Amino acid sequence: MTISEELFSRAQQHIPGGVNSPVRAFRGVGGAPVFFSKGEGAYLYDEDGKRYIDYVGSWGPMILGHAHPDVRQALERQLANGLGFGAPTRIEIDMAEKVCELVPSIEMVRMVNSGTEATMSAIRLARGFTGRDKIVKFEGCYHGHADSLLVKAGSGALTLGIPDSPGVPASVAEHTLTLTYNDAIMVREVFARHGDEIAAIIVEPVAGNMNCIPPEPGFLETLRAVCDEHGSLLIFDEVMTGFRVALGGAQQVYGVKPDLTTLGKVIGAGLPVGAFGGRRDVMSHIAPLGPVYQAGTLSGNPLAMACGLTMLNKISEPGFYDALAAKTEALAKGLQERAQAAGVPLTINQVGGMFGFFFSEEKKVSRFEQVTRCDLERFRKFYHGMLDKGVYLAPSAYEAGFVSAAHSDEDIQATLDAASSLFASM
């Protein structure tokens, strides 16, 4: 028995399912989860001392790699001055100014402690600003575990086969209209019927919680258009894509400007953090300026602000995203070529430093129903084979992968070599 297996057995005695977030339980791939003790650069080390090339990156935020020296120094400097004050600080202003500088659609921003808090608060704000109740979301998109957003959700909910959760009142769920991602016609039809009741559309501009699904041409533009036509707000959930697919997020890549944006992951450099921001007139409805209440004891905590600001300064350096995209493209193309050579049907999607692969006969995977038809058993075999060879991928066929600046050409090649030997045996 490995140390990870022993720890998992212990964990199940006092932690529900042995984990503090469901997808970590390996239900999507089988077996016991790996327990890690250290991260450094592009690598993770488990409790048995085995090293892995990491393509999870703490589910996205480790864009510089684990334990980057500059981030560690920023954390240590702030630790010397205190962990938190529950009061305003200079560094939260610096952070807000930097976010608004890098994401032009954000004129004002409010810091929170998680992506779920960010999306929950953005929805409340949209409802308060418009005076409407209904929201539109998309099947397979995950926006955290707030009640109104746990309807046909992606991520861990999809992995466990429970995209609708008990405990969500029908009276809450009835205000959530769930449509098909990348179906612009359906969006227009729903707005034709309910447009004057809809407060907002919330969407992952690149759907990263049913693996990695980019928007089809015209889809995001349609969302912008119908919101303008009906007085609804467009919310981009960029918790995953923000500062990950480009410096200005997916809205920069696709040239569509939302009214509100939610952020998380990268902006905390691995520490718990979230944010939501957007148009000044909308954000002015948040207390204490306006009547929509939102608060948090640890919001804007100086540890996360110090690390996040350091992270944003590093990724703002010239050429950072070109290099990151080139590495990710080399990995994606390499996987595709090796699978094809072995006769294994594989479809790859990639946007910037984010990628996803599907064991599927379909040449293009762009809809939720296509994702659910992929070969899960083949994914499980591939996953455990790569794990044995020292490559750590997301333990679910419905989660995206991430490349960091710390991944070297040698890391990419080692990953491709491991995949090639597995494809040959499949």
Curated annotation (Swiss-Prot):
Cellular-component GO terms for this entry: cytoplasm
Keywords tagged on the record: Cytoplasm, Isomerase, Porphyrin biosynthesis, Pyridoxal phosphate
Pathway: Porphyrin-containing compound metabolism; protoporphyrin-IX biosynthesis; 5-aminolevulinate from L-glutamyl-tRNA(Glu): step 2/2
GO molecular function, one term: pyridoxal phosphate binding
EC number: 5.4.3.8
InterPro entries reported for this sequence: 4pyrrol_synth_GluAld_NH2Trfase, Aminotrans_3, Aminotrans_3_PPA_site, PyrdxlP-dep_Trfase, PyrdxlP-dep_Trfase_major, PyrdxlP-dep_Trfase_small
Principal EC category: isomerase
UniProt xrefs under Pfam families: Aminotran_3
Location relative to the cell: Cytoplasm
Cofactor needs: pyridoxal 5'-phosphate
GO-annotated biological processes: protoporphyrinogen IX biosynthetic process
SUPFAM superfamilies: PLP-dependent transferases (SSF53383)
Complex and partners: Homodimer.
Name of the protein described by the UniProt record: Glutamate-1-semialdehyde 2,1-aminomutase
Organism whose genome encodes this protein: Hahella chejuensis (strain KCTC 2396)
